[in-house]
Regions:
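Active-site/ligand-binding-proximal alpha/beta "capping" segment
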Residues: 162-205, 209-215
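Structured adenosyl-cofactor binding patch, chiefly the S-adenosyl-L-methionine
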Residues: 200-242
């Protein structure tokens, strides 16, 4: 049976820990109805260990930490998502699904046609933690503060490849796929525009920076759909070429 996972801080020398977080205690006691002796998984963003519930008290739970679990699910490809800020629910969906498919860093960007200019960091961090627990990944993606499109271009210069998703660009094809997987790439940037699309100036700047210009489909995707499709498609192709 698959063990339930929880994101909790612990150090390499810890043999036990006390869970005092009210929400986690409630989840273990009243939602999952776990009992003394049941095993769970604990991860801290770097390592994962098995844990055994030793005692469930009224407001806290004592866990005995056991052996480390070797997790081979994490991709070796460092994928960074540069996504224009979207309306609240749509951007939350992007953050959740990007976490689930293994994105390492998320950069909310302000582009010319962006209509949303801020987000609730605390809410997003909660979404990231829960998506990491569910998807069985160990590391949590880094959610950066909002940056401008120009700042995103500078940040993306560290990547071996940057993919710019745009409806006016060539359709992703088998030829492009073969060209892509023939390269040894371990860092990838994926750029997703706002609801109103990229401006002509932004498209030209992406071309000037030698971005791979791609239309994902002949169908017109919403921005949040494009983000999920793109990060999975390109990270999957490159990971399979590893």
């Amino acid at each position: 049976m698959r063990l339930h996972r929880f994101f909790l801080p612990f150090s390499a020398t810890d043999n036990s820990l006390i869970i005092a977080d009210e929400k986690i205690v409630n989840q273990i006691k009243n939602v999952l109805r776990l009992k003394d002796g049941d095993e769970i998984l604990i991860f801290n963003g770097e390592k994962e260990r098995k844990g055994k519930i030793e005692e469930i008290a009224k407001n806290a739970i004592r866990i005995i930490l056991k052996e480390e679990v070797i997790n081979l699910r994490e991709s070796k490809i460092k994928v960074k998502l540069f996504c224009s800020l979207l309306k609240k629910d749509n951007f939350e969906l992007v953050v959740q699904k990007a976490t689930e498919v293994g994105v390492k860093e998320i950069y909310p960007i302000i582009s010319k046609r962006t209509v949303k200019f801020d987000f609730k960091k605390e809410r997003m961090d909660k979404i990231i933690k829960e998506a990491s627990e569910q998807s069985m990944r160990i590391s949590l993606p880094i959610l950066h503060q909002t940056i401008s499109f120009q700042e995103a271009l500078k940040e993306s210069s560290q990547n071996q490849l940057n993919v710019f998703c745009d409806l006016s660009s060539p359709l992703f094809s088998e030829t492009l796929k073969e060209k892509l997987i023939s390269k040894k790439i371990d860092s990838l940037g994926v750029f997703i525009g706002p609801e109103g699309g990229w401006s002509e100036e932004e498209i030209h700047l992406a071309k000037d920076n030698n971005f791979l210009m791609v239309k994902l489909s002949d169908l017109v995707f919403r921005s949040e759909t494009a983000a999920i499709v793109a990060v999975y498609l390109f990270s999957h192709l490159l990971a399979n070429n590893d």
